Amino acid sequence: MLNILFADGFEEVEALSVVDMARRAGIEVKMISLNETNEVIGGHNISIICDCMLKDAAIDDGVVLPGGIPGVPNIEKNPDAIEFIKKHYNENKLIAAICAAPTLLGRIGLLDNKKAVCYPDLMDELICKEKVDENVVIDSNIITSKSAGTALDFAFEIIKYLKDETVAKKVKNAIYY
């Protein structure tokens, strides 16, 4: 199962592209609210209802951190969310972050020995072993990506990681990508 963290102010395209493409690939996805209810409001005032709240979530195959401001700061100020992310990391599970979210991973020490990318205007804030100017960067169990414009590529790399290239190609073909 793939966990996706939703905090108020999340970037809708980055989060929901991953949910949609992963489900099309047959990956079970759990949308996790960091709020006191299952409802979360995105950065562009799109409300979604998550599957559960963080207190009811478990460590699974991976965790995705969408970008967005104030979405990423809202994840970062939640100590339970940080612990949840670190538990996935410590169990060598997939950690995928896009846009502003890789900067959070850097600040909590998860990119110390990794190459990564983030939203171009935030590259100076990215703490990692090597900054790479690519749309999606994969280093071991960490996948990072630039922005809403690279969200589908990000989703397909997550599918490749959890399934394989063939499944990712089938989903791409199904949406005429």
Predicted features along the sequence, with ranges:
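Conserved beta-strand segments that form the floor/walls of ligand-binding pockets within enzyme
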Residues: 5, 64, 96-97, 117, ...
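A conserved active-site-flanking secondary-structure segment within enzyme catalytic domains
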Residues: 111-136
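Extended, subdomain-level signal for the structured scaffold at the beginning of enzyme domains
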Residues: 1-91, 104-107, 125-133, 141-177
